[in-house]
Amino acid sequence: MIPVVALVGRPNVGKSTLFNRLTRTRDALVADFPGLTRDRKYGRAELEEHEFIVIDTGGIDGTEEGVETKMAEQSLAAIEEADVVLFLVDGRAGLTVSDEAIAKHLRSRDKPTFLVVNKIDGIDADSACAEFWKLGVDAMYQVAAAHNRGVTALMERALAPFAESLKGNDEEGLIDLSSVEDIEKADLTEEDAEAAYKRLQEQPIKLAIIGRPNVGKSTLTNRILGEERVVVYDMPGTTRDSIYIPMERDGQEYVLIDTAGVRRRKNMNQVVEKFSVIQTLKAVEDANVVLLIIDARENISDQDLSLLGFVLNSGRSLVLAVNKWDGLDNEVKERVKSELDRRLGFIDFARIHFISALHGTGVGHLYDSVIEAYKSATKRISTSLLTRIMQMAQDDHQPPMVRGRRVKLKYAHAGGYNPPIIVIHGNQVNDLPASYKRYLMNYYRRSLEMMGTPIRIQFQNSENPFETTKQKLTVSQARKRKRLTGMIHNRRK
């Protein structure tokens, strides 16, 4: 059994810094002000050849109001999940009432707990740590997480009871929730496309839930999971990190990615907000399918369209969910649908669902569209079928003339998946106008019944081996030309 280590403490004592140090990532946001981490965030870490799971939590300071009360609940839940608790305190700030309150709670839980005095670099560590003995601990560990001082010794001691059970666990599969590997762009060859297809079949479906702040992303995530896994509060921006959560439904494995709400650039008053947006956009790149949430009670904004554009440019499959649909009268619903048709007509390949994440209305149908979009994006298509469809499209509508010559399409094959890439070979294909390229893309979409995914078509000119060589007559051709030239000359006389 892989041990679970929870990092707890009041705000801004360095929990996220230690999380990043252990997982060797920057997946937990770090900045020099309290309250930055709000959800339980899971990551995989390794000590020598042994693996363990780390949980980063929001801070508890005993003065929680509003959303911070929710954050405290997440921290307490992490304590219950953990096999080992690392209780972090700030060596520079000294002992506080909040530290004493947390220590009291931890004593009541009867969990293996290690007191970790962080930020001891540049100070007299022994003097700074002396007052923390009041917490009644058996052992104290001095670290500087930002500089990796004392971290290895701490983890060796904390994981010592699990050392025997950790041996031989290397073969166990563990999804890395903190640094999910990017799907590589497939090269334009059939062999690499096949390799990309096989790689995708071995992975769970990664579903990123994105949208502007406060449209209901975390509410939907919790509805899907059936627990208060992600902080939900009626205030924009309560999710700042991208949260990776594994789940299974009807035998299909998923990794849900709940992202920070993306807001307009002018509203990003803090560096942290900008960094969260970067994490969101990285989550889109990492996903197989993107579920974009739109607020039914607000007009479609330029930010919604900007997000759509990013998803399409990334080549990710797309499902749209119009949230907060409950409670709207019929007139408002018709107006919203009309607005969607007018402004989102360019993504007619994506399914649109009208849901209430809070009450669960319509949420179950989202899975059908997610599966449909994923299957469309990863559908294996033979070269013969792609070539046959290309020929049918060419017969129905001939390519235009380019410099007095008809463009000729020869054959097509798969070049990659997620998104599907179709490679068409022919003469002068790079000179095809954009209108004919769109025609081919739509023809393939209809013929292959692809729904929920963009299609990319790459064109490659077939090389003419004689294009750069100078034609040279054979001996017999030269004699014939000379004889014909002589005959013409004699007739003129």
From Swiss-Prot:
Tell me which Gene3D superfamilies the record gives.
3.30.300.20, P-loop containing nucleotide triphosphate hydrolases
User: What keywords tag this UniProt record?
Assistant: GTP-binding, Nucleotide-binding, Repeat, Ribosome biogenesis
Q: Which N-terminal stretch is annotated as signal sequence? A: none
- The answer to whether UniProt assigns keyword GTP-binding to this entry is yes
Q: Which residues bind GTP 1?
A: 9-16, 56-60, 118-121
Q: Please list the residue ranges annotated as the KH-like domain.
A: 379-463
Highest taxon, organism lineage: Bacteria
Q: What does this protein do?
A: GTPase that plays an essential role in the late steps of ribosome biogenesis.
From the Swiss-Prot or TrEMBL record, give the protein name. Answer: GTPase Der
- Origin species: Photobacterium profundum (strain SS9)
Q: Which gene encodes it?
A: der
